[in-house]
């Protein structure tokens, strides 16, 4: 069975969600959050209709990872 082609906006969606996730991380760090604090991050799968959230501890989040690193499915 052939794999469906990626939607043309998928790379942009991944980048935007990565910016949101990094901003969430930076804000938590700025506010003095503990490294063991669980936070919800947006799925970076690239699908516009995706609303999945991924719970990670602050210490599990890799700020330098590329867009598309956090995927729920």
Predicted feature descriptions by range:
Residues 1-73:
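Polybasic/polar functional segments that serve as interface/processing modules
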